[in-house]
């Protein structure tokens, strides 16, 4: 059937319902501030400020196709946490000053960045 519930005796939710609930949970306090400047033309992303957490930056990032690791140089960031569309969290490894983000066609929401590490990695919203 159509919709976000399966038509069975339990009315179980479909994956889209879980993804939507997680999207609302992860993005409801975020204000977009710019477009991520990816090195690869098949990688897309946006930078947000979390208004609930004093403007802490959040990166939303994904690939058009395939899977690939995105390396982001970080000097001030100490740890990063990624959340997939189903709400599963992963610790993003930082090795020798590079954050290693595992990308796929599914959106990864990454928090924990120091804004000084992102300031040259996005195009401000008013410019696009």
Locations of regions flagged by a protein language model:
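Carbohydrate-binding surface patches
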Residues: 38-78, 85
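Hydrophobic alpha-helix feature that most strongly marks membrane-spanning transmembrane helices
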Residues: 25-28, 64
